[in-house]
Regions:
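Alpha-helical membrane-protein topology signature
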Residues: 1-191
């Protein structure tokens, strides 16, 4: 029963990792990401993978802190949350160094840094874009360790990023206007 539950939580986590980017608000994105992290935490615990479970728990805590990064820049509460967020990165860095396993760890570390930077962003579009960009190093990590669900999730993230980029660039502009080099708009005659 435990292997089945472990896999079920793993696939549920993968599904949530695919769905978070469809949320409209940053807090909803974070809540869905946290749901995915909770599923992966159970997945790793049931498989007896202590290091992965510990890292997932640490990153789940960072995501929870991210919920409180909104607010007035001069707010004492916001300053405290920012300090706690930065302090929470230290155990992540220490665990990464202590369990280093070569090239896969390198790509996991880059993916983690990009993800943590993305969760620091309070603008929903920037938050989404940076976190989707973290799919690149995570895809390389997943491929190196042979994680098929990880590869599928990361490819979905890259596809979602490409779709959102294309949608932003090419949809919603008036007919007859195309962006030229350097961002200058040139009018094209439409017959």
């Amino acid at each position: 029963m435990t292997p089945f539950l472990a896999e079920a939580f793993g696939y549920a986590g993968s599904l949530l990792c695919c769905l978070w980017s469809f949320a409209r608000t940053r807090s909803t994105m974070l809540m869905v990401q946290m749901g995915g992290s909770a599923c992966f935490l159970l997945h790793w615990l049931l498989q007896g993978r202590g290091t992965a479970a510990t890292m997932t728990a640490l990153l789940l805590g960072i995501a929870a802190l991210s919920l409180f990064l909104d607010g007035s820049p001069d707010s004492p509460r916001l300053r405290l949350v920012r300090r706690l967020y930065l302090a929470a990165l230290l155990p992540v860095a220490l665990l990464t160094a202590a369990t280093w396993a070569g090239v896969p760890s390198f790509f996991a570390a880059i993916g983690t840094v990009i993800s943590c930077y993305g969760r620091w962003q309070t603008d929903p579009a920037r938050h989404r874009a940076v976190l989707l960009a973290s799919s690149v190093p995570w895809l390389l990590h997943s491929a190196l360790v042979g994680s098929v669900p990880g590869i599928c999730t990361d490819l979905f993230g890259l596809g979602r990023a490409a779709w959102l980029g294309w949608k932003r660039c090419c949809i919603g502009k008036p007919l007859g206007v195309r962006t030229g080099l350097g961002g200058a708009a040139a009018t094209v005659k439409v017959a």
